[in-house]
């Protein structure tokens, strides 16, 4: 069985090698073969736009873009109010910093629930139990 698998993989690799060697890959250059000249009608300055297509930008002294009183009553206004306080910047509640017993909470949040001696004893007992079960 292993000889037939080896033969199949060998034949397959030879077929793939001969089929890929027949292809010739061509490369495409990103640079154009020639650079076209700029049209003679192109000028350095931008052409002036007609008044109907030119954008209307507000100027500091003009009131053309300000809405009329009838439009301003239709447009909703956003009330300026203070944003809510940052919860990180708010001083913490002193009652929450004390544990139920009354002593302050430890600096780290990890608390060892089982002592190292007890955990090593449990580990030894577990290994003995596994060894005992493997005999039966």
Curated annotation (Swiss-Prot):
InterPro entries documented for this protein: AGP25/26
Topology class, membrane: Lipid-anchor; GPI-anchor
UniProt keyword Transit peptide present: no
Covalently attached lipid (GPI-anchor amidated serine), positions: 108
Protein location: Cell membrane
Ranges annotated as biased composition (Low complexity): 59-81
Bias (Polar residues) ranges: 40-53
Signal peptide: 1-21
Main location: membrane
Coiled-coil features, chain-numbered ranges: none
Region (Disordered): 38-95
Post-translational modification: O-glycosylated on the hydroxyproline residues.
Cellular component aspect of the GO annotation: plasma membrane; side of membrane
Domain of life: Eukaryota
Keywords noted in UniProt: Cell membrane, Glycoprotein, GPI-anchor, Lipoprotein, Membrane, Proteoglycan, Signal
Positions of the propeptide segment: 109-136
The protein's role, per its UniProt record: Proteoglycan that seems to be implicated in diverse developmental roles such as differentiation, cell-cell recognition, embryogenesis and programmed cell death.
Family to which this protein belongs: Belongs to the classical AGP family.
Name used for this protein in its record: Classical arabinogalactan protein 26
The organism of origin for this protein: Arabidopsis thaliana
């Amino acid at each position: 069985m292993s000889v037939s698998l080896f033969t199949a993989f060998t034949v397959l690799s030879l077929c793939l090698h001969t089929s890929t060697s027949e292809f010739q890959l061509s490369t495409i250059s990103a640079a154009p073969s020639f650079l076209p000249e700029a049209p003679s009608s192109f000028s350095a300055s931008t052409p002036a736009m007609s008044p109907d297509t030119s954008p209307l930008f507000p100027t500091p002294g003009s009131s053309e873009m300000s809405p009329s009183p009838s439009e301003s009553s239709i447009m909703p206004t956003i009330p300026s109010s203070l944003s809510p306080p940052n919860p990180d910047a708010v001083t913490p509640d002193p009652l929450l910093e004390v544990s139920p017993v009354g002593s302050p909470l430890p600096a780290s949040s990890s608390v060892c629930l089982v002592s190292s001696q007890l955990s090593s004893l449990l580990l030894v007992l577990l290994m003995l139990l596994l060894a005992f079960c493997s005999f039966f």
